[in-house]
Amino acid sequence: ELVLWQGAIMADESEVDISSFLAALDAPPGTATLKVPVVRRSAGVEAANLAAAFIEEGARLLAFVRSRAGAEAVAAQVRDRLSARGSANAGRVGAYRGGYLPEERRALEEAIRTGEVRALATTSALEMGLDISGLDATITVGWPGTRTSLRQQIGRAGRAGAPGTSVLIASDNPLDAYLVRHPEHILGKVEASVIDPSNPWVLAPHVAAAAAEIPIRPSDITYFGMELRGVVGRLVADGYLKRRPAGFFWDATRPERPSDLTDLRGAAGDVQIVDAATGTVIGTIDQASADAHVFPGAIYIHQGRTFHVLSLNSLATPTAPASQGWPRALLPEAGGGTRGSGHPGSREREEAQASSIIIPPARIDDTRVALVEEVRTPLRTRSATHTSVEVCAIEETHVCGDGTVTWHHGPTNVSTRVTDYDLLRLPGLEFIRNIELFLPTHTLPTKSTWFTLTPAALAAMGINAADLAGTLHATEHAMIGILPLVATCDRWDLGGLSTELHDDTGAPTVFIHDAFRGGAGHVLAGFNSARSWVAATLEAVSSCDCESGCPRCVQSPKCGNGNEPLSKQGAITLLAYLLDRAPGGE
């Protein structure tokens, strides 16, 4: 199914041509009448096929992919397709993403400008901020999260006198499926940004940077808000600011620069990935993702090369040897790799860290290192995560008319730990075995929106105990997938937890939380527009043609439990029940 839009989009009151066309490619139509299900090609496979075709026609292009692993995979698939056709351009395709060294990124940027490289599969890292334009085409693999991002990506194609082509390929997730059915949302007005300026984890680094320019005075509350006094007091207590008669100054004796504390991309420091054979830093990964992607024993892909993670050096917890639990016959062959084809710390310590440190502590600890070795292996790894949520306070409450559903919003502590991983074998990701990990627990103080159900609600819906966990889990996934339609965010900016009986609420509960320290305002926007949020989620799930759940409705690519258990029908029942019992509809 191919849906095309031609014409113009609005930007700053003026019409801007969208190049030749903007296209959204949907997967094959419904299969309900077929005895044999149709296997849908993934958006990444579609993108690789299309990129190879563009390159063979002489085009230069960027393919925007949602994840680092996705960028590597699409680049490898494009090279494979061109190699199979005997194309000389197979070696002129690369990947570009965060985690590459600066010299690698600069070389790739220059190569795509000059035409030495014909195509790059990239994350949003090439979306803006770099002088790369005048390409022939762009491919956007999956909705990029906002109309702003989409227009930035489209703007990379075309130049004076030579219009370009931009293609949007819908991914298998609830939001993309919804947008294909409602294309008017794609070409609407640019969204308003959502940010919580009172969040001390956001405000404190900016106050520190401002104090390095001119002293902070009480009158600056006009600019920084009522939270300024408390934030300044904490910065002084933690040794970042010094009090002088003229105001509060940055402590110039500190080793770091104040600007180092402010990360506009929201990361919290990087883990260096080091080749054990040479001592060379081959890349970096943010602290929040490190445990899930470069744990001891993980298989890590970098520029089409395969690496085996030997260790992840953490100051808090020693790690087990990478080979622990690996079948001896399956240990990877080291050398000659080719291009192309902890135990948790005490609860008291975590709570103390969460409550007393404004500058994210991960910025101070820049010494984590993942040691890797290059290998040739058909093995891949997939980690699993355990999550728990502690309710710290309640700031907003909505009780529905019959009292069977209660919605809340407020601060929570979300604790996660990577617990184990599956060892898989290509090409079909055949399961070999599960291996336990001993990594530390990380606690994120953030904001959540959650709802609870009474026994009367479960009885009214006819949801029994056997189906409850799958119902809540599927509903959580679907609501996370659709929230970006209501709040300016990405599903990767969110997290969630569903439980049949939560310790703090004493009831079946679904939590959706911001994946940012102190919160980002996304789930508050969801709370305030919960009725619209639930309505869109219900439509996305109920209109999906699958029988028992798929990535387009209730499965999640970031699920730490392997998308088990899930009940699509239970989610439809629960969402329909929530629709008239959600806030934001008055």
Placement of each model-derived feature along the sequence:
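Helicase motor core with emphasis on the C-terminal RecA-like subdomain
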Residues: 1-216, 220-257, 266-268, 278
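Extended Lys/Arg-rich polyanion-binding regions
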Residues: 163-166, 172-189, 206-210, 214-218, ...
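Short cysteine clusters
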Residues: 544, 549-553
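Cys/His-rich metal-chelating microdomains
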Residues: 556
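Short, non-ligating residues that shape and space the ligands of small metal-coordination modules
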Residues: 559-560
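Short Fe-S-cluster ligation motifs
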Residues: 575-586
